[in-house]
Regions:
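Sec-dependent N-terminal signal peptides of Gram-positive bacterial secreted proteins and lipoproteins
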Residues: 2-23
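Extracellular/luminal ectodomains and secreted, surface-exposed scaffolds of diverse proteins
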Residues: 94-117
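Aromatic-residue detector
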Residues: 4-7, 69, 100-102, 147-149
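N-terminal small/polar-rich segments of proteins
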Residues: 22-96, 116-162
Length: 162
């Protein structure tokens, strides 16, 4: 019985050593292997906090829109658009409004924010400063009361303009 078990074990060991594994068929010469990875885009944008405008102030700092951090593809950018009706609405009387405008300053360029406005950022640290503007005539015409408006900041990952 020992001889049969010994022969079986020797046979199993000999057959195991005869197995060769191949990862790639190698015809000779050189072969290339490609290594790939994907790095997903990431970014963080800061927008202005809630702001109170003092009565009779013609210009109030609204804060800034800032691209705090960014890992973008070379041909991409982060775009921020602003939606508002640009009217401060009286909390009691919907007909009573105080019109206002927003001014965006990017470096030395200043423009009035409207429906077509878009700030485009490509590098972390870029920012656009915003100001709220109300004319003295609009303050003088305002009824007493509390006023508010909501400004919506839309943030998108877009193709960069060349």
């Amino acid at each position: 019985m020992k001889k049969i078990i010994t022969l079986a074990l020797v046979g199993a060991m000999l057959s195991a050593t005869g197995i060769t594994a191949f990862a790639v068929d190698y015809p000779g010469g050189s072969q290339d292997t490609e290594i790939k990875t994907t790095v997903a885009p990431t970014f963080t944008v800061s927008i202005p906090a809630d702001t109170t405008v003092a009565f009779n102030d013609l210009t109030t700092d609204f804060g800034s829109v800032t691209l705090d951090s960014a890992r973008l593809a070379p041909n991409k950018a982060v775009q921020v658009t602003i939606e508002s009706d640009f009217d401060l609405n009286n909390s009691v009387d919907n007909e009573a409004v105080i019109p206002y405008s927003l001014t965006a300053t990017d470096g030395t360029d200043e423009e009035t924010v409207d429906a077509d406005y878009a700030a485009t950022f490509r590098t972390a640290g870029e920012k656009t400063d915003l100001k709220i503007n109300i004319t003295q005539a609009d303050w003088d015409a305002a009824a007493a009361g509390d006023y508010s408006d909501t400004v919506t900041f839309n943030i998108a990952y877009v193709d960069a303009a060349e």
